[in-house]
Amino acid sequence: MWALLPQRWQVLIIGASAVILVTAIDALALHFTGRDAGPLKYLSLAVTIFTAGIVFLAQLFWFKAAELIPWLQTKTFPDLNGTWTGVLRSTYKAPGSDTPWPPIDTTVTIKQTLLTISITLQSGESKSYSNREHFEPDYRNKHFRVWYSYSNEPKAEFRHRSAPHDGVAYLEMDWEVDRNRLTGRYYNDRGSSGDLDLKRKVNPKRR
C-alpha cells in the first residue's frame, strides 16, 4: 500500500533505500574482488537481501492473508482485485440531441498489488484505462475511495458521436454495507458526468 504513505515518508524511504542499495552493491563488488568490505557495507547487503525478500513475499501473500484476516484490509486498504459489472448512468447527450444517454452496461477490471493499482472500464462502445490513481481511506467510517484519472478510447464505428476524451473518476466501497459493491462518479473533459454502480463477480472462496 505504497500510495497510502505520506509523500514525505515516500521520499525518505526512497532516499534511504538508494543509499543502502549503493552500499550493498559496493560490498558485493569488494567481496568478489577478494577485498574486505567492512561490517557496515556487509550490513547494508544483508538489509537489502532481507528487504527484497520481505517485499517479494508480501507481494505474493498479502492479499491471501488479508482475505483470511479481513481486519488487515480495514487498517490498510481493501482488496479490490477482480471483475466488477454493473451500470453507468451518464449525463452525456449525443450531438444534436437533448435526450440523456440510456444506462450503459459496464465491466470494470481492477488489478491491485501492494505497490500499484490499475482500473480498466469496458462498455459496448469504448474502453478506458486509468493512468494515475490515489487512495483515499476513511478509517473511522470504513469508507474506502480510489480516485483515478483515465483516458477513454471509443471504437472506430462510434467516433462520429463519441470522441476520445480524458476524465477523472472515483470508486468507493462501504466496508460495513457490502464489500463486493462499488459506487462512484466520473467527470470528463466533454463536460459530462455520470454515476457508476458495480458488483464484484465473487469467487466462492472470497469472504
Which residues are covered by each model-predicted region?
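Central antiparallel beta-sheet cores of small beta-barrel/beta-sandwich binding domains
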Residues: A3-L5, P70-R207
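Amphipathic/hydrophobic helical signal segments and adjacent flexible N-terminal regions
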Residues: M1-D79, R89-K93, V202-R207
